[in-house]
Amino acid sequence: MAPHVLVVPFPGQGHMNPMVQFAKRLASKGVATTLVTTRFIQRTADVDAHPAMVEAISDGHDEGGFASAAGVAEYLEKQAAAASASLASLVEARASSADAFTCVVYDSYEDWVLPVARRMGLPAVPFSTQSCAVSAVYYHFSQGRLAVPPGAAADGSDGGAGAAALSEAFLGLPEMERSELPSFVFDHGPYPTIAMQAIKQFAHAGKDDWVLFNSFEELETEVLAGLTKYLKARAIGPCVPLPTAGRTAGANGRITYGANLVKPEDACTKWLDTKPDRSVAYVSFGSLASLGNAQKEELARGLLAAGKPFLWVVRASDEHQVPRYLLAEATATGAAMVVPWCPQLDVLAHPAVGCFVTHCGWNSTLEALSFGVPMVAMALWTDQPTNARNVELAWGAGVRARRDAGAGVFLRGEVERCVRAVMDGGEAASAARKAAGEWRDRARAAVAPGGSSDRNLDEFVQFVRAGATEK
């Protein structure tokens, strides 16, 4: 039987992007690959995974998608039930045909996929859309090998909030303060269901079980070495469209993953064309984070004080919080631009961009490294504090902003300090720019033919082919 891999991402932009790119690369290796999306996304968005194929299943919200759910918990519960049945039907419909599925690769947050695959007799391989470091923290925490230090005491002292304690001498993780750990290990926040999924996503995996990571060996060498003691962990990233990965621009000339759930603005790249090289601060906090009025004002004042042109992405749902009265002059004179969305890969690839003010979601972090853009890391929650720590301390590709403990926000002076640190041309800026450029070269080498991630993908292809032969 010929191998045929079914790729099942979580139906959100940040989770789909790397798995669409993975599906493309796997298919380019000569393995039949089908990417699964939802019926709502298939109808409302242009998903191009060529040379992989695309099939749609039900997530229980066929008419309105995630936005039609009463909340996150309701969506996930209904999705698990509907998608389990729909995915099983898709697999069963092909079971006796020449293009039957022989393996499933699924987003590690989609824990409902594993029992479906097992019931169908298919090997199931989790794909982590987060860093190896964050995944390792979740995994070791779930296994009782990592102890989280306590938070601040009631009297205001640190309450012993020192480094996270590892019960074994070498797990590949550096010592981290409580504030540098993924927040879900000590605070489930407003999404307890997602927090538990994060912590338990690899709990079932054993030493011989494949786990694929959207990272590359050179970036997270020690962490990967630690993970391979417990899992068959392989880095196959960065799953970012890059020239060395066979990337070709779309019909509109853009660098694209192939799945845009939000229509980007065109005007921002034309605005960037008018700016000198490395002169613009690009500011974006992803598709989920909501900064609030106070943080938006501090951010605006800090960016203005830094004196650099800036391109700021603010979701349409949060646009009413933008302090327009502060930005009126800057936007009128072309010193600033505020847009609801933009083609981020094109922006990061643009020579005018000198730094990326980012929440340090893993996709954004990996994209900045892949395009050699220094970062100002303003982590908010979940995996972001760990990524921000590594941007500054492990990779030297930017600086971390420190949140004011009393105000609970990043103050304007801290924003100004960080932007100037990576853009003013001093020693720190030169070092960050040099490191970012070196990581860009390593990232592209990793996915180029014969690179570390390319070799790991070839190893996975061999596993898939061997499994199909046995059927």
Curated annotation (Swiss-Prot):
Its EC number is 2.4.1.121. Pfam families: UDPGT (PF00201). Coiled coil: none annotated. InterPro entries: UDP_glucos_trans (IPR002213), UDP_glycos_trans_CS (IPR035595). Keywords: Glycosyltransferase, Transferase. It comes from the Eukaryota. The keyword Glycoprotein does not apply. The keyword Methyltransferase does not apply. An anthocyanidin binds at residue 15. GO terms for cellular component: cytoplasm. GO terms for molecular function: indole-3-acetate beta-glucosyltransferase activity; quercetin 3-O-glucosyltransferase activity; quercetin 7-O-glucosyltransferase activity. Belongs to the UDP-glycosyltransferase family. This is Indole-3-acetate beta-glucosyltransferase.
